Design a protein with these regions (language model features):
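Terminal helix/beta-alpha structural elements that buttress the NAD(P)+-binding lobe
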Residues: 1-206
């Protein structure tokens, strides 16, 4: 664990971020490439924006109308307000569309992809189609779906830990709850209003 970061701050660094890192690595994103992150205020999306910027990618990110400044602080080069604009009708094209909330689909996002571009989602997609599309679309070699399965391996944890220690990645924490309020924490998460991560703080007995 980085010496300059508390356990509460680093604990969320291996949750949404390991999904985001698996997606980014599977897409083989390089410096200078263009990426759209749908859902940049969630645990996965907020990590994805920061991890992509650490690689030198140019990031467009979507968010609700009350969080554009937060998303810019995460590093997004451009922010799309989902209440004012349908991101799937964006004029720009991308090397990767990373759907961090799993609320869109390859069919809707396909037009956003450059030739050879990738769509990756945190969810199975409509009718659980994403794993199947991940098998079929690479054969067409134009625009494809990826469906990486993240693993908690030591190399990934060390990599994320190093980024946290250097300040290139800071897990976004919305709220902290003590263990005896864990039910309240779950209710808040299920409300759909959280941003980033919710941390349960376990204190040693007196």
């Amino acid at each position: 664990m980085p010496a300059n970061v508390s356990f509460e701050e680093v604990a969320p660094g291996t949750e949404g971020s390991h999904y985001a890192l698996a997606m980014i690595r599977k897409a083989q994103i390089r410096s200078g490439q263009d990426v759209l992150v749908n859902g940049a205020t969630g645990a996965i999306g907020s990590a994805a924006v920061q991890l992509l910027k650490s690689l030198g990618a140019t990031v467009t990110a979507t968010c609700p109308p009350d969080h554009p400044e937060l998303v810019r602080k995460l590093g997004a080069d451009r922010v799309i307000d989902i209440s004012a604009e349908d991101f799937t009708k964006d004029k720009q094209t991308y090397d990767l569309v990373l759907d961090a909330v799993g609320k869109s689909s390859f069919a809707r996002c396909r037009r956003l992809l450059k030739p050879g571009g990738c769509y990756v989602s945190s969810e199975l997609g409509p009718r659980a189609q994403n794993p199947l599309l991940a098998l079929i679309t690479p054969l067409l070699r134009r625009r494809m779906v990826l469906f990486p399965i993240p693993r908690h391996d030591q190399e990934m944890i060390r990599h994320l830990s190093a980024l946290i220690g250097s300040g290139e990645f800071t897990p976004l924490i919305d709220r902290r709850y003590p263990l005896d309020r864990i039910t309240e924490a779950y209710r808040y998460v299920e409300s759909g209003h959280k941003i980033g991560n919710v941390v349960i703080v376990v204190r040693p007995p007196d």
